[in-house]
Amino acid sequence: MKTLLAVLLAACVLTQVLSAPSNEQRVRRNMIRGRPRGGMKKTPPMSSVSHMINFDNVVSSTFTQTLDHFDSSVGKTFQQRYYHNNQWYKAGGPAFLMLGGEGPESSYWVSYPGLEITNLAAKQGAWVFDIEHRFYGETHPTSDMSVPNLKYLSSAQAIEDAAAFIKAMTAKFPQLANAKWVTFGGSYSGALAAWTRAKHPELVYAAVGSSGPVQAEVDFKEYLEVVQNSITRNSTECAASVTQGFNLVASLLQTSDGRKQLKTAFHLCQDIQMDDKSLKYFWETVYSPYMEVVQYSGDAAGSFATQLTISHAICRYHINTKSTPLQKLKQVNDYFNQVSGYFGCNDIDYNGFISFMKDETFGEAQSDRAWVWQTCTEFGYYQSTSSATAGPWFGGVSNLPAQYYIDECTAIYGAAYNSQEVQTSVDYTNQYYGGRDNLNTDRILLPNGDIDPWHALGKLTSSNSNIVPVVINGTAHCADMYGASSLDSMYLTNARQRISDVLDGWLHAN
């Protein structure tokens, strides 16, 4: 962007691990363009929750999908993975479709009891479906992920996939001939849920798009502004300590002895290189735990519910006056890695990362290569330090400019993917979907947590009574999608009720 067992997190944010010459594992940083490994919509391994699920009605299958919905001359198809469950279906009930996003899907979202979508399905008597996004998980539309093939990867194609799927399922299951279809999603797929309703109102009756960044933006400087503000909101003392630490890192980078201290503190696999790209890649590694903790703080998703929260994973260390500023950063990094199950040295090899991302097979780099492609060709979403407020707080406005990420587009996919192309693509995305201010649709619910950095690109207000933003005080990314917990705030509880009430009103209006 979806209380779960404590083992959930390790599989949700699986880290890319390589063998190091010293026999110590190399841990590649977890956050890539705001996306943790496994995707932004947290999902546990089914083995950890299967004992809580009734699988009698859960079906996993594939659907013959069109490769190019906009050029019939291509004439190719592929097998798209999907899941469905009619456990809660009642005659005349609606169909709920969870849209896959930038990671693999599983039967979790159609079967796990107590989730927002399954609770709503039980209330409305809905048949629940989940379709995996092309080029993610086991859905491989082409033989590899070369640039010519990646041109079939876009949100527009994914929306047409959903439309074709709805038509096919309506034909396959006569019970659904007159069903009202509701699309659901979280994070990128939350935006997809809203856009699918907008592009296909004849097929999609309503949408619930949780934490959907419906505004594309090249220089997403607001992301780190929200990280700063969310930590400050938790504790001004903590925030002062965090920025003190980041600015100390900037100072230590200037000397050989300082860089040695940083290598030891952050347990780096390599010496810090002073070329521009390597330094920026190092900064991404430093920021990554803070970004991920804030993005999911308090979500009822494994360790983020209690351990990886702003209070426990960040401020608990930064208000410890017995530690030095550098020790505090180290303690946050060590604790994050320990809880997440990441053991080994932190890999800061920029060139190695680019080589990893250039892998064209459906292998270890699959989801990262696909998601970065979409940022380069549609969305931007580049979490920069260019903000006049957040930049200095994070140790320097030039530490991570948007251009750094654009240069990665060029390095990974080729010279055609340059600044002009990225900006043109982002402008087109906003024109095609309407951006935040011109969503041309109705009957969409748009929940957002106000400590989530992604809410800055969401739709938070609306003059249209049938476009319903639900801003949830003190919650993070996709918080509404998970199961209710005793730790939930009244704001989150009330938001889930609001979503349920609005959707109920729409479904029974006619």
From Swiss-Prot:
Q: Which cysteines are joined by disulfide bonds?
A: none
Q: What is the lineage of its organism?
A: Eukaryota, Metazoa, Ecdysozoa, Nematoda, Chromadorea
The reply to whether Signal figures as a keyword in the UniProt entry is: yes
What EC number(s) would the UniProt record show? 3.4.-.-
Q: Signal peptide: which range, if any?
A: 1-19
Task: Name the InterPro entries on file.
Answer: AB_hydrolase_fold (IPR029058), Peptidase_S28 (IPR008758), Ser_carbopepase_S28_SKS (IPR042269)
Q: Name one GO biological process term.
A: innate immune response
Protein's UniProt name = Putative serine protease K12H4.7
Q: Which residues are glycosylated?
A: 234, 473
A GO molecular function term, named singly, is: dipeptidyl-peptidase activity
The protein's superkingdom reads Eukaryota
Q: Which Gene3D superfamilies match?
A: alpha/beta hydrolase (3.40.50.1820), Serine carboxypeptidase S28, SKS domain (1.20.120.980)
Catalytic site = 187, 452, 477
The UniProt keyword set, sorted, is: Glycoprotein, Hydrolase, Protease, Serine protease, Signal
The organism of origin for this protein: Caenorhabditis elegans
What family does this belong to?
Belongs to the peptidase S28 family.
